[in-house]
Amino acid sequence: MKRITCMIFLLCTVFVLSAQESAKTLVVDLKSHETKKVLVVAHRGDWRNAPENSLQAFQNCMAMGVDMIEIDLKMTKDNQLVIMHDNTIDRTTDGKGKVSDYTLAELRKFRLKNGLGRVTFHSIPTLEEVLELTKGKILINIDKGYDYFQEVYKLLVKTQTI
């Protein structure tokens, strides 16, 4: 039993270290003018197998070997940054209205819809949750986020993802 536990620990350690190294390698490739590597970018995550912009959609991307995810930001009524492409939550959740009309706690009550419009158990993630999930594993392209530059920067520092 000790041997199995040690093996699992070693495998997990190797996986975590290689994941952290992979993000660093991707940054080098992204900045290089000489690389011939094509980066695979997933717009709103793996929206075919999970609700778009859900933590599961981003987790699926990492499992598939995607290099980068593209996300969009919206600000809640209580100044929390969440991941949402549209100006309203109408299409992607079982709620209605603008993100800015709700607090984060209120938004958490809504469920994300899958690509076929069916309600799932997934909720709207915060930027901080996405940064923690993807830290050192995959690159993130933050689109529609310039208006929130200062808030994003603070979260990057807080999560040590800068």
Indicate where each model-derived feature is located.
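Phosphate-group recognition and catalysis centered on beta-loop-alpha active-site segments
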Residues: 19-162
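Bacterial Sec-dependent N-terminal signal peptides
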Residues: 1-23
